[in-house]
């Protein structure tokens, strides 16, 4: 499966912003990182809610089909986890954004797919 990713320069910028958020908890850093990803994929920014823990501490993030993302805040991530590294948290954010990118706007994507499948099929008419 071929996957379209942002250019390396944009990915590095997003990674730096997520790293800065993990260290300083500035909400603007996180919002800029998510906005950059969403801008590349032409999606609305997801609604992100922060939690101390999710699913009794077994889950670090959760994405719903309506575009809502639940994440463990870095402040809480550092406290109560066995694997509490910055890299692991950033990886979790990317994982949940992957869910968001592939689930987002399913109806619209299905409609576009359907229309492109039939485009040119009845060319003789």
Spans of model-derived segments:
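Zn2+-dependent metallopeptidase catalytic core
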Residues: 25-45
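Active-site recognition of the HExxH zinc-binding catalytic motif
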Residues: 91-103, 111
């Amino acid at each position: 499966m071929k996957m379209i990713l942002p250019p390396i320069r944009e990915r590095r910028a997003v990674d730096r912003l997520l790293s800065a958020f993990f260290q300083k908890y500035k909400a603007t850093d996180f919002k800029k990182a998510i906005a950059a990803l969403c801008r590349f994929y032409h999606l609305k920014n997801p609604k992100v809610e922060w939690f101390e823990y999710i699913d009794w501490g077994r889950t670090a993030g959760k994405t719903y089909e309506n575009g809502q993302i639940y994440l463990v805040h870095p402040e809480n991530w550092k406290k109560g986890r066995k694997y509490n590294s910055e890299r692991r948290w950033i990886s979790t954010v990317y994982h949940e954004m992957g869910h968001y990118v592939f689930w987002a706007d399913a109806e619209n994507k299905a409609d576009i797919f359907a229309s492109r499948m039939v485009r040119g099929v009845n060319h003789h008419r």
